[in-house]
Amino acid sequence: MAGITMGSEHMYDDTTFPTNDPESSWKIVLAGEKFMTASAALKTIVGCVKNPLITFSDDGLMIQGTVCGQRMFVPIDCTSFSEYEWRGPTAIFLALTDSRRTLLDAFKCDKKKVVEVCFTFRGEPPCRHLTQTVTYANDGCSFSSTIVKYELWSASIICPQKTPDATFSLNKQQLSKILTVAAKVQHEELIFALKAEGGFYAGTICDVISFDIDGSAMVQYPYNATSHASSALIVACGKKKTNKSIAVTAYGSGKPFCLALEDTNAFRNVVQKIKTGAAGADLGFYTTCDPPMLCVRPHVFGSPTAFLFCNSDCMSIYELEEVSAVSGAIKSKRISEYFPKVSNIGSRKRGPSSPPFEREGKLAKVINQ
């Protein structure tokens, strides 16, 4: 992000709320079931997102921030709002205020029950301002609070394109297998690959797992999970195959790729935060972007979508398979060396055992004494 300049920000109560010509203003409203859906999607991240920005455009609302050290984008489509009207070019607002309040506080779960969130916009770019009015209901009465934010005059943000180049739909068990692999090492690269011979792979320097692919919806993917040739090639790799009977549904480009996330911990933490209650997730790969990105979209209606930056300058999946086989063996050997079984600890301290006849003589001597 480069060169952010922003105006001041103000907070008003109901008695000092500024008035303007209604014809020069427009608004976006979340209420009822649509508010509950959006709140459920955001509740897992609103308490931990750092430096959040909120972007409004014709497509909807986008929340951008940092979660667990990784950039995360949470898009909410315009159809997900109770009322959505937008005028002019895209506007960017800093969610934080001078106090502890933020524009995302309305989506936190607390004792005050929010019934409606209204964003009212006035002005002309680049001097538009946003008025957020949050209406609460408690014990038969209602009250509201208001925050006014001014548009960032100069800001540069990254908005991912809508459709990934390749998407893999994983069920809950398949996603858990990848998370298990990521948990075996700390702060190492997690590599994803679509092989030219067929099959979707995920792994680290310690372990690699593979999945059969149902590529009937893919373009330029010559293999299918039901073909004997593809199965033979995957089995020949010598790696264990996850969910053997259930193929991963894939769509998009079938062109081979190999991308890496720099930190297994970040991937695991982010996915754990957004996958609550999900029956699985879609992993979408933006292979033609610079830098490439990974999109994680849980199989829950209204759930947030995380976008993580990847690196294409990484170890190939073939090299990773070789390294994981050797590294895994070395790791197991070191564990047995540094943490021997209790039954072996005493034997390592003693010297070589005496011949049987010497042991019998020593035992007789002890008894005579």
UniProtKB/Swiss-Prot annotation:
It is found in: Host nucleus. Residues 345-369 are annotated as: Disordered. Transmembrane segments: none annotated. It comes from the Viruses. One of its GO terms (molecular function) is DNA binding. Disulfide bonds: none annotated. One of its GO terms (cellular component) is host cell nucleus. GO terms for biological process: DNA replication. Pfam families: Herpes_UL42. Keywords: DNA replication, DNA-binding, Host nucleus. Interacts with the DNA polymerase catalytic subunit. Interacts with the origin-binding protein. Belongs to the herpesviridae DNA polymerase processivity factor family. Plays an essential role in viral DNA replication by acting as the polymerase accessory subunit. Associates with the viral polymerase to increase its processivity and forms high-affinity direct interactions with DNA. Facilitates the origin-binding protein UL9 loading onto DNA thus increasing its ability to assemble into a functional complex capable of unwinding duplex DNA. This is DNA polymerase processivity factor. It comes from Gallid herpesvirus 2 (strain Chicken/Md5/ATCC VR-987).
